């Protein structure tokens, strides 16, 4: 039976930017394991086209980023797949299934998934079932379409690849063995003396995470120069203007993003250690060791930056690498059910894994934003074996923020060797009270709010999806960025000013750049208003239109401004070859702005509704309508 099973090999691949597609891939991997496939999970960039043909089936999960682009960790794979040297039919021995993660508030919904799917078909690969697609705007989120699709996938896998005679799928109530387990680094479990320090009470102020730098692939060291609150203390939201100096010279353009890697706070880590009864071993050096399940697999380590030689402690893992404050997924409850001796707790945990109780799961987790730590505090009978913690608690991922400045090198001071690159961010600190009257804080923004001048942290810099180039300088831009969506617009305004100084263009633009902004109050969260006025007074070809939704009885939003100034927008776009940029919250805002644009095109272009929509689609196809929302 072992030989027969080894012939049923599944390769699960993902292209992910925020981690959602990776979560989906790992769940698909568990499904395949339960059907007794020898399963490997990896990012798309980690495999060659040749490897696609070395597995019985390839299962793909991919999200769409930017303007219908593939995530960075899949672009090398996509480049290889698009090679003109590949002949039609070269992948005819490949069987696959794919699931896309998208957002219907974007014009190019699930575009990356569809491009990848169609290219695989073009090269001869054959799907074993219909492709699946999720919508971020679905009331039930990803699960709304993922759960039905996985049922179809399971049936297709069993039909195409029947289990060896005498074998049955691994039941859902049987725990899958992780590929890697934690073990003591030394037989005597020597306590750590150089890792994260033990935490304790710090009097009136909350103790902050340690300042040790993290080892991240492509990681850069950034020094905090300022972390200023822009909104008054009386305002409901704390919004920060964070300024960082990054070691070295790093070119970036408007729309690019900086990823900050947060840490959990000592108070939460201590609570987790305490409820799991891990205090005696929390600071002992540990390492990862392969389990029996990884004998025939090239499984990656639970912490991507680790090697088999790396050592750590439970406290370090919980501080730097495990997301103990994230909202748990269904699979988390299934795993917890194995680690309780309380029958009531076990039954309740298993209820949350049943698709019939999806509304109850939503009401328990997503609606009140209940965290993993809080779940464990409520199900106090659950005791996770420390050896398996990395297979149960999800990885703590970096958070991306659109850069709010143009690229500027900072002259090194006598105390600093080498060049530094200034990067500024506009960040809304997530802190609110839930329906169950508990204070919630964003993991990343709570960490960011704690940063102090001269503190160092690890960041990475990556390309965004706006595609701004200097060649567009002779065209006006229409920038629509309410709230913190103004961050990349500020970068764009600054960058265009820099480019004009560096390379004066002979033909001055015949239309001003237009910036549309909205917030709640003119005196509370009108970000960079003095800066806009200074630019305009100095002759920068810029007009700024701002709306304040709470300063009068009738609420005014950014789409209302677009309607009011639709003549200028149409002239800039239709007559001056202008480019439209939209940034900010996903969901209703981009759709409302899109509708306002279409109505303006109808009015000033004397177009029918159908022709106005076609005009907007043409702008998208030509790269003159670009959206980056989150």
Functional labels for PLM-detected ranges:
Residues 1-630:
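FNR-like FAD-binding dehydrogenase module
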């Amino acid at each position: 039976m072992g030989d027969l099973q080894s012939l049923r090999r599944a390769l699960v691949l993902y292209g992910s930017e925020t981690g959602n597609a990776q979560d989906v891939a790992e769940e698909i991997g568990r499904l395949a394991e339960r059907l007794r496939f020898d399963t490997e999970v990896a990012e798309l960039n980690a495999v060659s086209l040749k490897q696609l043909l070395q597995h019985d089936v390839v299962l793909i999960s991919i999200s769409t980023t930017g303007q219908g682009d593939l995530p960075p960790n899949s672009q090398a794979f996509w480049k290889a797949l698009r090679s003109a040297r590949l002949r039609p039919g070269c992948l005819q021995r490949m069987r696959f299934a794919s699931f896309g993660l998208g957002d219907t508030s974007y014009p190019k919904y699930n575009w990356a998934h569809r491009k990848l799917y169609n290219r695989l078909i073009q090269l001869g690969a054959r799907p074993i079932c219909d492709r699946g697609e999720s919508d971020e705007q679905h009331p039930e989120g990803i699960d709304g379409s993922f759960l039905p699709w996985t049922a179809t996938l399971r049936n297709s896998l069993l039909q195409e690849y029947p289990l060896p005679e005498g074998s049955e799928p691994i039941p859902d109530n049987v725990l899958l063995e992780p590929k890697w387990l934690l073990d003591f680094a030394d037989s005597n479990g020597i306590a750590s003396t150089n890792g994260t320090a033990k935490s304790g009470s710090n009097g009136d102020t909350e103790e902050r995470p340690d300042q040790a730098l993290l080892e991240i692939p492509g990681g850069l060291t950034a020094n905090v120069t300022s972390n200023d609150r822009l909104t008054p203390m009386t305002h409901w939201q704390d919004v920060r203007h964070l300024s960082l100096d990054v070691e070295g010279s790093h070119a970036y353009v408007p729309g690019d993003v900086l990823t900050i890697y947060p840490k959990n706070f000592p108070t939460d880590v201590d609570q987790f250690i305490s409820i799991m009864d891990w205090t005696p071993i929390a600071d002992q050096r540990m390492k990862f060791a392969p389990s029996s399940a990884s004998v025939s697999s090239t499984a990656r380590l639970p912490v991507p930056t680790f090697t088999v030689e790396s050592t750590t402690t439970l406290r370090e893992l919980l501080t730097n690498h495990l997301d103990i404050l994230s909202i748990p997924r269904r699979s988390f409850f299934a795993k917890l059910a194995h680690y309780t001796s309380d029958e009531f707790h076990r039954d309740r945990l298993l209820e949350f894994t049943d698709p019939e109780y999806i509304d109850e799961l939503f009401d328990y987790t997503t609606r009140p934003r209940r965290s993993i730590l809080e779940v464990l505090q409520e199900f106090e009978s659950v005791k996770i074996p420390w050896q398996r913690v990395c297979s149960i608690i999800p990885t703590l991922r970096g958070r991306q923020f659109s850069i709010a400045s143009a690229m500027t090198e900072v002259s090194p001071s006598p105390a600093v060797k080498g060049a530094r690159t200034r990067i500024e961010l506009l960040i809304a600190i997530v802190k609110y009270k839930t329906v169950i009257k508990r204070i919630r804080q964003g993991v990343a923004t709570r960490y960011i709010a704690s940063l102090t001048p001269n503190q160092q942290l690890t960041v990475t810099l990556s390309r965004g999806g706006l595609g701004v180039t200097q060649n567009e300088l002779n065209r006006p831009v229409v920038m629509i960025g309410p709230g913190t969506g103004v961050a990349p617009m500020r970068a764009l305004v600054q960058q265009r000013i820099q480019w004009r100084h560096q390379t004066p263009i002979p033909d001055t633009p015949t239309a001003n750049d237009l910036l549309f902004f909205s917030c709640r109050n003119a005196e509370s969260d009108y970000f960079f208003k003095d800066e806009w006025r200074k630019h305009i007074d100095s002759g920068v070809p810029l007009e700024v239109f701002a709306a304040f939704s709470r300063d009068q009885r009738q609420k005014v939003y950014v789409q209302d401004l677009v309607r009011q100034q639709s003549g200028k927008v149409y002239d800039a776009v239709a007559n001056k070859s202008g480019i439209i940029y939209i940034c900010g919250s996903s969901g209703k805002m981009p759709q409302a702005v899109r509708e306002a644009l279409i109505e303006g095109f109808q009015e000033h272009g004397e177009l029918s509704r159908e022709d106005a929509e076609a005009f907007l689609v043409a702008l998208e196809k030509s790269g003159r309508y670009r959206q980056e929302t989150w």
